[in-house]
Amino acid sequence: LKLPSFPIGQIYGLSFNDDNNRIAMTLNSSRSPGDVYVLNIKNKKLTQWTKSEVGGLDTDNFVSPELVRIKSYDDLEISGFLYLPRDKKGPHPVIISIHGGPESQFRPGFSSRFQYWINELGCAVLATNVRGSAGFGKTFVKLDNGFNREKSVKDIGAFLDMIDKDNRLDSNRIGVYGGSYGGYMVLASMTH
């Protein structure tokens, strides 16, 4: 079954209709906090049924991230999502965002905070998935357990190296943000 292209985001809440010829789903993307879409299986047409309220803001100004994959200090592949200001000259200051958990994961979902930083402050945002993040397999999620916790801090160092090599980003203007476990990682990153 060849499907139409979907907006980049998270799909959840799948439900078939009684005749099993349509699938309803919720899509949360970087440009929308959650809308209902229906896919007609016969004609493969995807229809958006709702348009989420975002406080009167123009969602055309919201940006979608690009997936970045890098090698960490020990050649382990780690990833994140890089959000860049639209139509603004760089290099951009960068806010590195570290998720809580540690067994959580950044996905390209809606974040009013990120969109504010990008559109109002002109900052790029790098939402990181260091070792120990969920969604990359059982082995990956255990890579920061116990005495290995410091390895995830070194992953932030690898992202700093990436920023330094990317001419769209200003490696002299970097902030680090996180709450809960992400807050621990902010403090640990700043002391290394």
Please place each PLM-identified region on the residue numbering.
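Residue-level detector of Asp-centered blade-edge/turn motifs that repeat once per structural unit
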Residues: 18-19
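A flexible loop/linker signature enriched in serine peptidases of the S9 family
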Residues: 7-9, 27-35, 106, 132
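Short coil/turn segments at the loop-to-beta-strand junctions that recur within blades
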Residues: 6-11, 53-57
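Cap/lid segment of the alpha/beta-hydrolase catalytic domain
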Residues: 45, 51-172, 177-180
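Short glycine-enriched nucleophile-adjacent loop
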Residues: 183-192
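Hydrophobic beta-strand positions that form the internal "hydrophobic ladder"
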Residues: 23-24
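Beta-propeller blade-edge and WD-like acidic-aromatic loop motif
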Residues: 1-2, 28-49
